[in-house]
Amino acid sequence: MVRSLKKGPFVANDLFKKIEKLNNKGKKKVLVTWSRSSTIVPVMIGHTIAVHNGREHIPVFITDKMVGHKLGEFSLTRTYRGHAKTDKKSKR
């Protein structure tokens, strides 16, 4: 289901405060976060946010086309290594 417009988008408070502080100072810095469920809002455009994928933090540069999506969509948690081969060496 879609979140109610009355409530507004979810953004973690600590992440939002850090971005507001950087915007007031006019600085650009990599922000580290574990909040994959936070929605990208227009205030975040131009910042680089390192999103945790369960093993490491993946830096994500926020552009205007990402607004409305979740941070977790841009740091994949699973690595695809390909299907098993059918040759004789892989059967051993």
Swiss-Prot record:
Species, as recorded: Oedogonium cardiacum
PROSITE patterns recorded: RIBOSOMAL_S19
Subcellular location: Plastid, Chloroplast
Keyword check for Ribonucleoprotein: yes
GO annotation, cellular component aspect: chloroplast; mitochondrial small ribosomal subunit
GO molecular function: rRNA binding; structural constituent of ribosome
Gene Ontology biological-process entries: ribosomal small subunit assembly; translation
Function description: Protein S19 forms a complex with S13 that binds strongly to the 16S ribosomal RNA.
Keyword rRNA-binding carried by entry: yes
UniProt-listed SUPFAM superfamilies: Ribosomal protein S19
InterPro entries per record: Ribosomal_uS19, Ribosomal_uS19_bac-type, Ribosomal_uS19_CS, Ribosomal_uS19_SF
Keyword terms, alphabetized: Chloroplast, Plastid, Ribonucleoprotein, Ribosomal protein, RNA-binding, rRNA-binding
Family: Belongs to the universal ribosomal protein uS19 family.
PANTHER family noted in UniProt: RIBOSOMAL PROTEIN S19P FAMILY MEMBER (PTHR11880), SMALL RIBOSOMAL SUBUNIT PROTEIN US19M (PTHR11880:SF8)
Name of this protein: Small ribosomal subunit protein uS19c
